[in-house]
Every structure is written in C-alpha cells, then in structure tokens.
Amino acid sequence: MARTLKLRSAVLLAGIAALAVATQAEAGGDAAKGKTYFTRCAICHSNASGAPNRIGPNLFGVVGRKAGAIPGFFYSPAMKKSGITWTEDKLEAYIAKPQTIVPGNRMAFAGVADHQQVDDLVAYLETLK
C-alpha cells in the first residue's frame, strides 16, 4: 500500500513538473528567434544603444519606456497622446495589431499574425538594455 502511494505521488509530481515546463515554454518567447524576426523591423528601426532613429524610433531600451518619448523623433499625435508605457503585454498587442492599439499611428505595418513570433520578438526586445 505504501509503495503504491509513493508511486502515485511520484507520477503525480512528474506530471506537474512536465506541465509547469510546458506552460513556461508556451508563455515566453525565444529571443534568438526574435532577433531573426527583427530583421524585418530593422528596415525602419535601429536597435543599438546610441544609434540614430530611422524611419521609426530606435527600439533599444523600449521595454519600460513611455511611448513617444525619444527626443527628436517625429511621432504621430496619436502616439504622443497614447499614454502607453511599453510593457511586455502592450508590445505584444501593438506588434500584433498596431492600428488597433494606437489608431492613427504612423507605422506602416499591418502587424504580426503569428502569436509565437510576437512572443519571440518581445523576448528579443527585452534583451535590448
């Protein structure tokens, strides 16, 4: 009886551990893949400390930054008035559907439909510190 209880406990713990690992993997993005996806973003955005803005603002340090806050960049009135602080959730939503999150912004990009690619991009942006 005790042996059966130990076996059941071990199986239950193994199942919980496997579920926790799977949930963690789904919840986060892969920064290395995100860096690869960023090549599309790099057409308009720089990503290095001190690099000049391009058509879009430099995204170095974007996580935690207030939207429309880089001095000297010509933001749309909509972006300036948005009041957004770029958290992980806000970045995910914006990358997926920019015009839905900030209607009237100037970014000429429809968004990324693949949720995993969005997660990967945000994971990469989080490394830019």
Predicted regions and their residues:
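N-terminal signal peptide c-region/cleavage motif recognized by signal peptidases
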Residues: 20-24
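Intrinsically disordered and other compositionally biased segments
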Residues: 8-10, 27, 51
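Generic cytosolic/nucleocytoplasmic N-terminal low-complexity/intrinsically disordered segments
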Residues: 5, 32-34, 89
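Bacterial N-terminal signal peptides that target proteins for export
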Residues: 1-12
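Periplasmic/extracellular electron-transfer cofactor-ligation site
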Residues: 29-74, 80-85, 97-103, 127-129
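C-terminal capping alpha-helices of c-type cytochrome domains
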Residues: 85-129
